[in-house]
UniProtKB/Swiss-Prot annotation:
The record marks N9 as: Discriminates between blocked and unblocked aminoacyl-tRNA. Monomer. This is Peptidyl-tRNA hydrolase. GO terms for biological process: protein quality control for misfolded or incompletely synthesized proteins; rescue of stalled ribosome.
Amino acid sequence: MYLVVGLGNIGKEYKKTRHNIGFDVVDIIAEKYNIEINRQKFKGSYGEGRIGNEKIILLKPSTYMNLSGESVIEAANFYKIDKENIIVIYDDMSIDIGKLRVRGKGSAGGHNGIKNIIQHLNSDIFPRVRVGIGQPDENVVNYVLGKFSKDEREIIEKVLAMSAKACISIVEDGVTEAMNKYNGVKIEV
């Protein structure tokens, strides 16, 4: 069983912002596998389904980004999911737009949502899909809570689809295979 977590902030004003990439990827997976994310529990919205023979729980924490660990630990404990089977999808400023990076473990890298998840799980050993949003020329908060330009949005839509495929690959083939397949790929207009 896998817990697939998309990080983001709740509220219409955050829809389609850089910081909500995780929510967007979870929505793509939900659509592909006909999983309704319409249940409220674990301080978030979630749905249950299958990818092949694997049961998956899709979770969108409603705690705001910096407290995402509260939601993740509640769902993981309830379903008794191993940390190695918790996949977290989130935005990453250290990666260029058009790229993603799959990792099996690692530090928070300055991302407060991941930092909170690491604290609550008491471990940094869980797979993640880091989606590049590029470096800001402006205030970081304004940047991550801002929307993509039209040109960026064209690239991001393709990256979101690729990120969903990377998550599915982790479930079906394992982290190493997903890393080999998706790390280093760059999508351009």
